[in-house]
Regions:
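Short helix-loop-beta junction
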Residues: 61, 371-375, 622-630
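Acidic, divalent-metal-coordinating active-site segment for phosphoryl/phosphodiester hydrolysis
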Residues: 642-644
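N-terminal glycine-rich anion-binding loops that anchor highly charged ligand groups
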Residues: 23-38, 43-62, 66, 71-74, ...
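N-terminal amphipathic alpha-helix/helix-capping segment at the start of soluble metabolic enzymes
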Residues: 1-39, 154-160, 296-354, 359-363, ...
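Catalytic alpha/beta core domains of metabolic enzymes, predominantly
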Residues: 134-150, 154-155, 176-325, 431-438, ...
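Active-site beta->alpha loop and helix N-cap motifs at the rims of alpha/beta catalytic domains
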Residues: 10-13, 63-194, 342, 355-366, ...
Length: 645
């Protein structure tokens, strides 16, 4: 079993990371305060009127902290006029000066703003892309040089009562860090901690840290490693979360939701910014959508509705995870055959979606299957398995009629059918589905429950059909509920019992899925428990029912993206009321953001700021219009040299 430093209190149960409170002007950050929402202006900082107008627009949208770039002394000095005009208009939002390359601008900005952001990769270093082997003495000399450049800012911020963000960017690590640690999360963390240690030597502690990357996986790993390293060193500074250069549209929101939401799920993060290549005001509703469920827990910590499902009612040790939170490794699983589709093992994570009309409506169901399985344009991704729901004998008759019509419609997509095990148990022959999805009767005593499972599994095995056990808290059988309660642990023990019974009757193609609201904790516990029992059954990761586009986009991305970045999941399903095209697009955008399946061109574009000397939004649109056909290609569209050569 891998022994790694802990990055959070408990991977199976939400508890916010404890931090000190750092005040950004009148806005307290960290501790038990809500997750703060912030953004950054894209106007020219020398254009006072435009920057003031944009700041007011952000504040009216709900932005709590506004960052403004100060690339030179001129912009740093103009922050005084911007702040004065905002105060004249009754706007007291905290301002943050964004500094790269120019310590003199940071020293001037400290006189006017509530926080200064510096990048440890370029505050005292210039990027030369030089390869050099540093001895320990040479490296120490470099740290002393950096301290000499950085100390004046630390002392001035301390004198003025101004906070600092030490913000590492994956794309702008110094040559010194790159040569010793490489382009890695470890390098990102050490880059920041070097500056934190200097601050602490001068008894300055109003510090916020960030570990931004355009790749959500790298960003997640870096923040986790930072949390673990800081815990080891007795540091408790709050974190600013964000995926840099996330892009625009749905893709940018999905990347941000996965990166930021994965960390918030573990209680990590105190302020967030959703970086979009759009007008800055569009970032605010996206940020609130991500933060809302976590701030709701903070607002009502003792209310049952605000708490996740209990992990366990027992004092027994919880299972040890085999996943490495600081590096990606997909959970090993058996490969199963579902009709013509292979799932698990080395197969790509598959996309399964459900129809939303009753099965009795054969015409409507057929139309939805066609919409889900037919590419919108040549080469476009499609749903790889369509999920149907049957609750009665009449539904099974409708399913048989539907099957007869598929060849004439030119449809061959594998179908999965969800039905009660009692209904399956009563059938003389199985429906012609690639996979049957069911759960046994939880009210049966242990012996009859085992017999029902064995009969159903044996029937499935004889017909060569795949089997998925789908579990909710209500499906935990009473004899297991007595031991484990209606808990995540109860779900995991129910799943392992079902898989073991299937092995007894030699069912080769078995999967497990869960349908419970704390999806991340539940699937993590399930995977850890199954692995501890030597059961490499594939996992179908699905969301609970999500209604409306906002919930599907943000909550679906957070839950599924977190699990996929943890290496969990062999197929995925968003349970939503989205139209077919939108559900397919969102599913593949999640897979692409998690770096698991590339289905289109990957655009990495920064959100623009006062440094940008051209219209980044229209430029991005123009490049996309000409290059979106280049599947498997990554294209970076950058507004300046901060995160690029």
């Amino acid at each position: 079993m891998i022994t790694l430093p802990a990055y959070c209190h408990d991977p199976f149960s939400y508890r916010r990371r404890k931090t000190r409170v750092v005040s950004i002007g009148d806005v307290p950050l960290g501790g038990d305060y809500p997750i703060r929402i912030q953004s950054m202006t894209i106007s020219d900082t020398m254009d006072t009127a435009a920057t003031v107008a944009e700041t007011i627009q952000l504040v009216e949208a709900g932005c709590e902290i506004v960052r403004i770039t100060a690339p030179s002394l001129n912009e740093a000095e103009n922050l005084r006029h911007i702040k004065a005009e905002l105060h004249r208009r009754g706007i007291r939002v905290p301002l943050v000066a964004d500094i790269h390359f120019t310590p003199n601008a940071a020293l001037k900005a400290a006189e006017y703003v509530e926080k200064v952001r510096i990048n440890p990769g370029n505050y005292a270093d210039k990027k030369k892309f030089a390869t050099r082997e540093y001895s320990d003495n040479e490296y120490q000399a470099e740290l002393e040089r950096i301290e000499a450049r950085f100390k004046p800012l630390v002392l001035k911020l301390k004198q003025y009562g101004v906070a600092m963000r030490i913000g590492t960017n994956h794309g702008s690590l110094s040559d010194r860090i790159m040569n010793r640690f490489g382009d890695t999360p470890e390098g990102m963390v050490e880059s920041a901690l070097e500056f934190v240690r200097i601050c602490e030597r001068y008894d300055y502690h109003d510090i916020v840290l960030s570990m931004k990357a355009s790749n959500p996986l790298v960003m997640i790993q870096a923040y986790r490693l930072l949390a673990a390293r800081m815990a080891e060193e007795g540091m408790d500074y709050p974190f600013h979360l964000g995926v840099t250069e996330a892009g625009d549209g749905e893709e940018g929101r999905v990347k941000s939701a996965i990166g930021i939401g994965s960390l918030l799920e573990d209680g990590i993060g105190d302020t967030i910014r959703v970086s979009l290549t759009e007008d800055s005001v569009h970032e605010i509703p996206a940020a609130y959508a991500i933060a809302k469920p976590y701030n709701a827990r903070l607002a009502a910590p003792n209310q049952k509705a605000s708490l996740p499902v209990c992990v366990s009612t027992r004092t027994a040790p919880l299972p040890q995870e085999s996943r490495n939170p600081y590096g990606y490794r997909r959970r090993p699983s058996d490969e199963v055959r579902l009709g013509d589709l292979q799932v698990g093992g080395a197969q790509p994570v598959r996309v399964e979606l459900a129809t939303t009309v009753p099965l009795a409506d054969v015409d409507g169901t057929l139309a939805q299957i066609q919409a889900l399985s037919t590419p919108a344009q040549p080469g476009a991704p499609v749903c790889e398995m369509v999920r149907l729901q049957a609750t009665s004998g009449a539904d099974l008759e409708a399913f048989a009629r539907l099957r007869q019509r598929l060849p004439a419609a030119g449809l061959s997509v594998p179908l999965s059918l969800c039905l009660p095990l009692a209904l399956l148990d009563s059938l003389p022959t199985l429906p012609e589905a690639a996979k049957l999805i069911t759960a046994p009767d939880p009210l049966l005593p242990e012996g009859p429950w085992h017999e029902q499972v064995r009969r159903g599994a044996a029937l499935v095995a004889r017909h060569g059909v795949g089997l998925e056990w789908t579990l909710r808290l209500e499906t935990i059988p009473h004899f297991l509920r007595a031991a484990y309660g209606a808990t995540i642990e109860g779900l995991a023990y129910t799943a392992s019992r079902l898989v073991e019974l299937c092995r007894e009757v030699a069912v080769p193609d078995v999967m497990v899925s869960l349908d419970t609201a704390p999806a991340v904790a539940a699937y993590r516990f399930l995977a850890a428990h199954l692995d501890s029992q030597g059961l490499a059954v594939p996992l179908h990761v699905k969301t609970p029912a999500l209604r409306g586009r906002t919930a599907a986009l943000f909550q679906g991305s957070i839950w599924l993206g977190t699990l996929l970045c943890d290496g969990l999941g062999d197929s995925l399903q968003i349970d939503s009321d989205l139209p077919a095209a939108e559900a397919i697009s969102l599913s593949y955008n999640i897979l692409q953001a998690a770096r698991l399946r590339m289905s289109k061109t990957e655009f990495i574009s920064c959100p623009s700021c006062g440094r940008t000397l051209f219209n980044l939004q229209t430029t991005t649109e123009r490049i996309k219009s000409r290059m979106s056909h280049l599947k498997d290609v990554k294209i970076a569209i950058m507004g300046c040299i901060v995160n690029g050569p």
